A protein has these predicted regions:
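Conserved N-terminal phosphate-binding loop of PLP-dependent enzymes in the Aspartate aminotransferase
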Residues: 3-476
Length: 476
């Protein structure tokens, strides 16, 4: 069988059995020939476009096929046309327990029925309870503050680092994602003909992914490749560096893991050069373990941010770390105090959801993590068997419940490696074919897939069967 054509980048558990892939498509009403499945979605989107630019409220949702989703339960989602899908997107990974997990939902209903409201003055018992849970179970967090989104948390982390160090320059990762604000809205999935060949040691030009970022500000941000300690030293030698921010695993472009000793090397360089090491665990935190991936790696950052799986889909984020740094939010000298404010910070609904989520993760001696690890391993082994059988040049990268198929002959170590070898076109085509047949992989190449506690062995088996069928047809 010939290999696929190259298209490199230059520019609470649900236990009901799942049907077979073909039965699934028939029962769900998903079209198998690719026509007419999303008529109601199109109608709703056309209405929305009259009032919302582009019809969506986040640019990441503007993907093909354009689908309006109306319901999520467990490991499944439904669209406006009645089509049902096994969900491996999980809204960019927050739904670690599954959609509408009963334990979390009950906690939210309870807090509302008990009269909780947004008070905007003083504090609440809920936020203190959540803060204690986090500080007790995450070694890197001695003190914590709450915000609404991961972007807010990374913004505040960088501001805090600049205040503490008295420096302005920061280091970010090419291909990483740390939010929408000016410090990090750059160098996402940059075409290689734009950023040029690999530089090590060295830095890449700031390539904004948004208009409206002042050029003067761009000069303070230095993108380098992941897994490259020499380039960290290079930047620190040239600029007074306030912070380095990175995901411990690059999960915006699949699953790119740190090389042996890399995170430990960042810790040593932070101590040597005096910059603040910020680990962005918005995607990795709670999904890979209560203490985050930093705990797994045995590395203690200065600051760490959490979100997504922290509240199983409810909007809340956390910024925590060393108390001596966090205390700058209440510094006795007003000229040194770092402003942190927000009307909706620690809103009782997402706060209750976060408490319930963490409680659920702690139950039964880690049954959630055992279950998703078992399913993740089954998915990886099944995919690898399919790829071998079909002779596909591809590998499977996985960490626990998160996985990605790379259509290349090795797991990438950074963006340059991925962009130069992965078959993006083939990847995206496979994802779209799977969606048409009731398996929802986010339809953008090299994006992480996520397994939840609500997925079952039957879900995994049905998914593997459908992937085998589609890859067989595509690779003939």
């Amino acid at each position: 069988m010939p290999l696929h054509n190259s298209d490199k980048v230059l520019d609470t558990q649900v236990t009901s059995p799942s049907p077979s892939p073909d039965e699934f498509c028939h029962q769900a009403g998903v079209d198998t020939d690719g026509s007419g499945a999303y008529a109601k979605s199109a109608q709703i989107l056309n209405h929305n476009r009259r009032f919302i630019p582009g019809g969506v409220v986040s640019v990441n949702r503007a993907v093909q096929p354009e689908i309006v989703f109306v319901k999520g339960q467990g490991a499944h989602i439904w669209d406006a046309d009645g089509n049902q899908y096994i969900d491996y997107h999980a809204a960019f990974a927050p739904h670690f327990l599954g959609h509408n997990d009963p334990y979390v939902t009950d906690a939210v209903i309870s807090v509302l029925q008990n009269g909780a409201s947004l008070f905007g003055s003083g504090t609440t018992e809920l936020e203190g309870h959540l803060a204690e849970l986090i500080c007790r179970h995450i070694p890197a967090v001695e003190s914590v503050q709450f915000l609404n989104t991961g972007s807010e948390a990374t913004y505040q982390a960088i501001r805090l680092a600049r205040a503490v160090t008295g420096r302005d320059h920061i280091v970010v990762m090419q291909g990483g994602y740390n939010g929408w604000h000016d410090d990090v809205s750059c160098n996402l999935m940059t075409p290689l003909d734009v950023i040029g060949p690999r530089l090590s040691p060295g830095e890449y030009p700031y390539i904004p992914i948004s208009a409206g970022i002042p050029r003067e500000h761009q000069q303070l941000v230095h993108p380098i490749n992941f897994n490259d300690l020499e380039s960290v030293e290079y930047v620190c030698q040239k600029y007074p560096t306030a912070a380095l921010i990175t995901e411990p695993i690059l999960q915006n472009i699949g699953i790119i893991k740190p090389s042996t000793g890399y995170l430990q090397g960042l810790r040593r360089l932070a101590d040597r050069w005096g910059f603040v090491l910020i680990i962005d665990e918005v995607k990795t935190g709670f999904r890979h373990g209560i203490g985050g991936y930093a705990k797994i790696a045995g590395v203690t950052p200065d600051l760490v941010v959490f979100g997504k799986a922290m509240a199983n889909g409810y909007p809340i984020a956390a910024l925590g770390g060393k108390k001596k740094l966090m205390d700058w939010f209440v510094h006795p000298d007003p000229s040194k105090r770092v402003l942190l404010a927000g009307t909706y910070n620690a809103h009782p609904v997402p706060t209750a959801a976060a408490i319930a989520t963490i409680e659920r993760l702690l139950m039964n001696d880690g049954e959630v993590y055992r279950h998703v690890e078992s399913l993740g391993r089954k998915m990886q082994e099944g995919l690898e068997k399919i790829l071998r059988t079909l002779g596909c040049e591809a590998v499977v990268a996985r960490q626990g419940s998160a996985f990605c198929i790379y259509f290349m002959d090795h797991c990438p170590r950074d963006w340059h490696d991925l962009a130069g070898h992965h078959d993006f076109g083939f990847d995206e085509e496979l994802r779209k074919k799977l969606i048409k047949r009731g398996t929802y992989f986010f339809p953008v190449a090299a994006k992480q897939c996520s397994i939840s506690f609500a997925h079952t062995i039957a879900d995994i088996e049905a998914t593997l069967e459908q992937i085998h069928k589609q890859l067989s047809a595509m690779s003939r």
